[in-house]
């Protein structure tokens, strides 16, 4: 069942259009080298991050991490496909993919989600599949 141990989280994920803004944000962060955004007040949040936070605030706390994991997985696949089209080296892809998960891990804290501060994604970097 992928990241969704709870069927209702899968439903929330679909209703939230797969956290579209979060996916775009994760994608953007993955493509930028350097460290991701530090937790900031809402004033300094880029609009896209703000949209992503809004999406996460609509989830039940229980579903925040599973839906984020689903979004991360989707972005990972996009990046992998793009990388193959551009003939990217595996190592660069791994960096980008690990940045997706780094960014996603801290999103609940960046977004001040109640009762969720960090999503414990496994840092296991799967080899090229």
From Swiss-Prot:
Coiled coil: none
GO-annotated molecular function: nutrient reservoir activity
Region Disordered, annotated ranges: 28-47
Compositionally biased spans, kind Low complexity: 32-47
Matching SMART domains: AAI
Keyword list, A-Z: Allergen, Disulfide bond, Seed storage protein, Storage protein
Xref: InterPro entries: Bifun_inhib/LTP/seed_sf, Bifunc_inhib/LTP/seed_store, Napin/2SS/CON
Pfam families for the chain: Tryp_alpha_amyl
Family under the similarity heading: Belongs to the 2S seed storage albumins family.
Biological role stated in the UniProt entry: This is a 2S seed storage protein.
Quaternary structure annotation from Swiss-Prot or TrEMBL: The mature protein consists of a small and a large chain linked by two disulfide bonds.
Protein name: Allergen Bra j 1-E
Species this protein is from: Brassica juncea (Indian mustard)
């Amino acid at each position: 069942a992928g990241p969704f141990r709870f069927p209702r989280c899968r439903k929330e994920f679909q209703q939230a259009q797969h956290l579209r803004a979060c996916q775009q944000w994760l994608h953007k962060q993955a493509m930028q080298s350097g460290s991701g955004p530090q937790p900031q007040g809402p004033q300094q949040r880029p609009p896209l991050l703000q949209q992503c936070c809004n999406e996460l605030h609509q989830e039940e706390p229980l579903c925040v991490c599973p839906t984020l994991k689903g979004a991360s997985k989707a972005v990972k696949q996009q990046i992998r496909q793009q990388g193959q089209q551009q003939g990217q080296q595996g190592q660069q892809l791994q960096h980008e993919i690990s940045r997706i998960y780094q960014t996603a891990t801290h999103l609940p804290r960046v977004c001040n989600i109640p009762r969720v501060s960090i999503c414990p994604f496994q840092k296991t970097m799967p080899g090229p599949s």
